[in-house]
């Protein structure tokens, strides 16, 4: 069963590389593996579970709806022209700046998918308008989700590490904050190198700016696209307590209202645009995420993921390698390294003292490695969202982020386990 599953995974990767219809490839692969396992219902149950996942659907369709409102009110053009004119003069700082900006937002908006939806809809068009290749622009935002939520005391992974290490969230962060900051710099620098080698850091011609040469900027309209991000950051940091109650979708709706007030566009047209964008987001972005979950269910049905997790648990003598490689590979394969990180920490890290290892270091290593693996997965929700914003194949993003992810996971292991 394991070998059959691995062969199907390789075929799936090949089909994605050939740019066959992504949703169809993932769905067929997941169903075939489920059939081979003798339980086809796992694929159908995964489909149903995804369709009921309001926590995932809500921010995605709201962000895509808001993006469409920005388009019909032309608020996006005001921001794009305002920033693109300045960004073009930054040269080599364009790409690393986008990576670090996304990481900063991701620290507060800890959902990689939610952060990508909120930031990508705004920042990716700006980068493209400034001359960055679409795939590189999307990769910059995608790479920015490398793991900066590990600096947020309220992040779930922090709570788990604190629990198994019998410590506090603040102690966990104090122990690894320097690692997370170093990884941010490595991610930004490595992607910049890739951009320079491929010649994608400048020179891309975008029609976005062709008709804006004599454009008169309305600064209020230019601020509207940033309003939801400002609300979310001020709320999550506690700067404005009232905003703390707002979800991502709420901030997007407020942004739509602001677009109306700034432009006085017909409310009916804004309403139609919002739901058209929401529908497109569901069909493209969420559709791929749903099919990816069907694929993952097929992988699980053949026992591949459980086998990998069990191998890590059964070999505590190589816990350092297991905590790094296991969650990282599972992040790549499944698009999320959280399951492996949590399983490892609750099964192995809890015995760190017996193994002669530092529980805080081991727990953080597993959590960070899983996040880094996700930034190398073409089926990760945030990869799909960013690719959708740039209208490119998710695999094109991975080709650009892979170098940084691999370097970062090695550096993480060295810093937390050997230095």
Please provide the spans of the model-predicted regions:
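Interfacial loop-to-helix junctions that mark the boundaries of transmembrane helices
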Residues: 17, 45-56, 169-178, 214-217, ...
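Re-entrant/interfacial helical elements at transmembrane boundaries that shape
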Residues: 80-81, 113-126, 155-165, 338-351, ...
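Short helix-coil transition sites and intra-membrane helix breaks within transmembrane domains
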Residues: 19-22, 55-56, 68-77, 106-118, ...
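Membrane-core helix-loop-helix motifs of multi-pass transport proteins
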Residues: 125-222, 382-419
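Core transmembrane alpha-helical segments of multi-pass membrane transporters/permeases
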Residues: 43-77, 249-304, 329
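Long, contiguous bundles of hydrophobic transmembrane helices that form the permeation core
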Residues: 2-5, 9, 26, 32-33, ...
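Membrane-interfacial loop-to-helix junctions in multi-pass transporters
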Residues: 1-3, 52-57, 84-100, 129-137, ...
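Hydrophobic alpha-helical transmembrane segments of multi-pass integral membrane proteins
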Residues: 59-62, 89-124, 288-294, 313-350, ...
């Amino acid at each position: 069963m394991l070998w059959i599953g691995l062969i199907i995974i390789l075929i799936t990767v090949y089909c994605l590389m050939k740019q066959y219809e992504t949703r169809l490839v993932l769905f067929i692969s997941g169903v075939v593996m489920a059939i081979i396992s003798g339980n086809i219902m796992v694929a159908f149950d995964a489909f149903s579970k995804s369709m009921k996942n309001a926590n995932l659907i809500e921010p995605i369709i709201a962000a895509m709806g808001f993006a469409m409102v920005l388009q019909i009110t032309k608020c996006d053009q005001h921001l794009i022209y305002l920033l693109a004119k300045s960004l073009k003069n930054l040269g080599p700082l364009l790409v690393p700046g986008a990576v670090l900006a996304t990481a900063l937002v991701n620290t507060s908006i800890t959902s990689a998918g939610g952060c990508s939806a909120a930031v990508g809809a705004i920042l990716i068009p700006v980068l493209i308008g400034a001359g960055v290749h679409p795939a590189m622009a999307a990769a910059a935002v995608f790479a920015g989700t490398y793991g900066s939520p590990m600096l947020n005391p309220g992040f779930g992974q922090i709570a788990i590490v604190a629990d198994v290490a019998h410590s506090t969230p603040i102690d966990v962060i104090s122990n690894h904050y320097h690692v997370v900051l170093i990884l941010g710099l490595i991610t930004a620098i490595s992607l910049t190198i890739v951009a320079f080698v491929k010649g994608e850091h400048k020179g891309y011609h975008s029609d976005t700016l062709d008709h804006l040469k004599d454009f008169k900027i309305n600064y209020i309209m230019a601020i509207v696209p940033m309003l939801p991000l400002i609300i979310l950051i001020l709320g999550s940091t506690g700067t404005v307590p009232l905003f703390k109650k707002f979800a991502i979708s709420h901030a997007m709706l407020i942004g739509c209202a602001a677009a109306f007030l700034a432009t006085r566009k017909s409310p009916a047209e804004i309403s139609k645009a919002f739901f058209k964008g929401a529908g497109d987001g569901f069909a493209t972005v969420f559709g791929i995420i749903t099919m990816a979950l069907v694929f993952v269910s097929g992988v699980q049905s053949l026992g591949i993921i459980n086998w990998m997790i069990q191998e890590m648990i059964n070999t505590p003598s190589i816990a350092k390698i297991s905590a790094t490689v296991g969650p990282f590979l599972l992040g790549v394969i499944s698009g999320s390294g959280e399951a492996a990180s949590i399983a490892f920490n609750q099964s192995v890290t809890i015995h760190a003292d017996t193994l002669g290892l530092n529980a805080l270091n081991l727990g953080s290593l597993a959590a960070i490695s899983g996040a880094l693996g996700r930034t190398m997965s073409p089926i990760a929700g945030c990869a799909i969202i960013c690719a959708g914003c740039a209208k490119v194949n998710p695999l094109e993003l991975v080709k650009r982020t892979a170098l940084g992810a691999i370097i970062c996971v090695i550096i993480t292991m060295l810093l937390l386990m050997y230095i």
